[in-house]
From Swiss-Prot:
Name of the protein described by the UniProt record: Putative outer membrane protein CPn_1034/CP_0818/CPj1034/CpB1074
Chief location: membrane
Subcellular location: Cell outer membrane
Keyword Membrane set for record: yes
One term under GO cellular component: cell outer membrane
Domain of life where this protein originates: Bacteria
Sorted UniProt keywords: Cell outer membrane, Membrane, Signal
Residues making up the signal peptide according to the UniProt record: 1-17
Membrane topology recorded in Swiss-Prot or TrEMBL: Peripheral membrane protein
Length: 262
């Protein structure tokens, strides 16, 4: 039995005669063969933050963004308002920060799938205002999706942006943006393979595929858990206090130690 079976949870379902399969993995190696040797006409769709890349500082990391949104919600701010308040600042911090890949093997997988001529693109909850930042970050990681991305047959709603193989939805929860995208794509794929670090997103896209009668392989991707942590509350606070010029985690830690000894 393959090693990856110990780390995956698989099951099948049917809706409109479309198969549905789920897996949870800690390395893309665990499902790479299933994807590479899948003979169906599939689209490979990938999440961005914490799936392909992550911020290199505590304040630029998505964990800070999530905690800030949750903090506002605890104070009574509605979810969408909290999202709209936090994300623009987080994007500004990302502009000043560094970016790290989650797992180099996933980029090799993307390259091999593209060489097969299979459709590949990114679906991110980032707003369309993050276009330039996102393209720069992917360029730094030598990722290009434009040549193998699908081409919609009609204009998207104004809240969405699709460019260079990246669908920017501005969704706090995944699903609605891709739904609108699928509505204007012809023909639809026989199958969608979706990779995201959040299980709830993987399940939502599975429900969406059932709606369209599209076969589905949803992969909850936990490779980030194998990395040393980047986010620390106290480091993020120091970086926030000096956010006009984003400090590295190391510089923030030195400053924090100095403050503690004063």
């Amino acid at each position: 039995m393959k090693t990856w079976l110990f780390f995956t949870f698989l099951f099948s379902c049917s809706s409109f005669y479309a198969s549905c399969r789920y897996a949870e993995v800690r390395s893309i190696h665990e499902v790479a063969g299933d994807i590479l040797y899948d003979e169906e006409n599939f689209w490979l769709i990938l999440d961005l933050d914490d799936t392909l890349l992550q911020g290199g500082e505590a304040l630029s990391h998505s964990i800070w963004k999530s905690k800030a949104i949750q903090g506002l919600q605890k104070q009574g701010t509605p979810e969408q308002e909290a999202w709209e308040a936090v994300v623009p600042f987080w994007i500004e911090i990302q502009e000043m920060g560094t970016v790290q890949p989650i797992e180099s093997a996933i980029f090799l997988l993307i390259e091999k799938i593209q060489k097969q001529g299979k459709t590949t693109f990114v679906y991110t909850e980032r707003p369309k205002t993050a276009k330039d930042l996102t393209l720069k970050q992917l360029h730094m990681l030598n990722v290009s999706l434009e040549d193998t991305a699908p081409q919609p047959q009609a204009p998207l709603p104004k809240n969405l942006l699709y460019t260079s193989g990246i669908l920017f939805s501005g969704d706090y929860h995944k699903g609605p943006g891709l739904d609108l995208f699928l509505e204007i794509c012809t023909p639809l794929p026989a199958k969608i393979i979706y990779i995201d670090n959040q299980k709830e997103n993987v399940l939502r896209i599975g429900d969406l595929c059932q709606k369209y009668g599209i076969a589905y392989f949803g992969i909850t991707y936990k490779a980030q858990e194998l990395h040393p942590p980047i986010y620390f509350d106290n480091i993020a606070q120091v970086q926030y206090n000096y956010s006009k010029k984003l400090l590295s985690n190391e510089a923030a830690a030195l400053l924090l130690r100095h403050q503690m000894h004063e």
